[in-house]
Amino acid sequence: AMKLSHKYLDIGADVIYGGNWSYKWIRALRDEYVPINSHVGLVPGNATWIGGFVAQGKTADKAIRILEHTLELQEAGAIGVELEVVPPKVAEVITKKVDIMTLSMGSGSGCDGQYLFANDVLGYTKGKIPRHARIYKDFKKEFEKLQSERVNAFKEFHSDTVNKKFNDPKITV
């Protein structure tokens, strides 16, 4: 993880996203000046263990646990945390109680910023669109048309190659 993190930073990454890494890993990366953004609430990789793709922190006990987890991530050295599908009031309270950046994904406007995937924003998510996603423009048909045109262009190229149509003086020396 350390080697790859430095590689990504060297090629332009601003931060490494560590969804559900251990505090030990986050501390080790912090000690090597690798900025880490972490993830609490609905962490998709943990869906099997948390009851599926459902909101987290809806009871007082679970909300407190998300706050404690966020504070532990802060102590370990994370520079920020994504709060995914957490009740807006819980996300707002957490944002006020931590010193690191908070990003909301389906957790209301009380965080420091918002986080959505480009394919959701642009409307070309395949399958079920998450409830917390917001589509701003529906590019699905345009992307499908563009993909069809790409395929057709390569078919034409293949045909010209098979039929030896590269003797045009405009493209040969």
Model-derived segments and spans:
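Alpha/beta enzyme core
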Residues: A1-V173
